């Protein structure tokens, strides 16, 4: 069974992941017209959790995320940024961040209620 501390770590890591994914998408969008720029992509959150789970020394709250170059199709100028994909990635990151913060907030509310304090 997942403990409350583990739950906080997972959703804290999910919020950090979403922020990193948003940052990567923003950088890709900002450099969309730069000749030769290769878009970057963040590993999936599932892959991150699997990697961190397999390493007993790794903490999901402090472990870094792997960012790699995208292998998408190249434009004639050597750039491979897809604005449509980046907008989708950005919206997905926003959704993940909102979910993580919502669950985190509700968990804190439950803990406060359990110890007899109101928010």
Regions found by a protein language model. Name each.
Residues 1-119:
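Amphipathic alpha-helical polymerization modules
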């Amino acid at each position: 069974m997942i403990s409350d501390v583990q739950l906080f770590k997972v959703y804290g890591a999910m919020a950090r992941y979403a922020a990193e994914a948003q940052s990567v998408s923003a950088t890709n969008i900002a450099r969309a017209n730069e000749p030769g720029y290769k878009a970057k992509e963040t590993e999936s959150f599932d892959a991150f959790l699997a990697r961190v789970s397999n390493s007993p020394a790794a903490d999901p709250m402090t472990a870094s995320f792997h960012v790699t170059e995208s292998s998408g199709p190249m434009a004639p100028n050597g750039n491979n940024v897809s604005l449509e994909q980046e907008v989708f990635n950005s919206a997905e990151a926003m959704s993940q961040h909102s979910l993580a913060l919502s669950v985190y907030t509700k968990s804190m509310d439950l803990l406060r209620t359990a110890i007899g304090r109101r928010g």
